[in-house]
UniProtKB/Swiss-Prot annotation:
UniProt KW keywords: Secreted, Signal
Residues spanning the signal sequence: 1-21
A cellular component term, taken from the record's GO annotations: extracellular region
Tissue expression: Component of the acid-soluble organic matrix of calcified layers of the shell (at protein level).
Organism: Lottia gigantea
Name of the protein this chain belongs to: Proline-rich protein 2
Subcellular location: Secreted
């Protein structure tokens, strides 16, 4: 087709009002259920939102939630035949599968720092006959703050107070 003819057809198509419905000029969202009164998109699950309707028509689109699928065919199993096992009479004893033996002692494993013959350093037990010196355990001139629950802002404040 000639370039001039193509441009002429385009201009005529833009001017003639009967051709206008077939030309996409913006999207009229007034009749679309995905948009509310003011043209805002309706909040919902985007995965199940209907696609925009390019052909404006009063007929509503009714999308199927899922495409119809045939149930999977499972072939029937062969009927089971009862195995030919002799019925245990009360006279025949039950033979155990695995004989229970004495448990084997575990192989001695020694930690490299606690090899056998090594005595860990022992501390002298406290002398109960003498009372504790008074200021030693329960008195601190600057008691440590009780941190309680982990709170990063308090920790930051403590650090700031310490660095000040």
């Amino acid at each position: 087709m000639n370039l001039k003819v193509g441009i002429a057809v385009l201009i005529i198509a833009l001017i003639v009002p009967s051709a206008q419905p077939y030309i996409y000029r913006g999207y009229d969202r007034s009749s679309d259920p995905n948009f509310d009164m003011f043209g805002r998109s309706v909040a919902g699950d985007n995965a199940y939102r209907q696609p925009l309707r390019t052909l404006q028509s009063p007929a509503p689109m009714v999308p199927r939630a899922m495409p119809l699928q045939r149930q999977m065919y499972v072939p029937p199993r062969a009927p089971m035949i009862a195995p030919r096992v002799p019925i245990r009479a009360p006279m025949s004893p039950v033979r155990p599968g695995v004989l229970q033996t004495q448990p084997v002692m575990p192989i001695p494993y020694h930690h490299p720092h606690y090899y056998p013959g090594y005595d860990p350093p022992s501390y002298d037990p406290p002398d109960i006959s003498q009372p504790d010196p008074p200021g030693e355990y329960f008195y601190h001139p600057r008691p440590r703050p009780n941190l309680g629950i982990y709170n990063p802002s308090r920790i930051t404040a403590f650090n700031r107070a310490y660095l000040r």
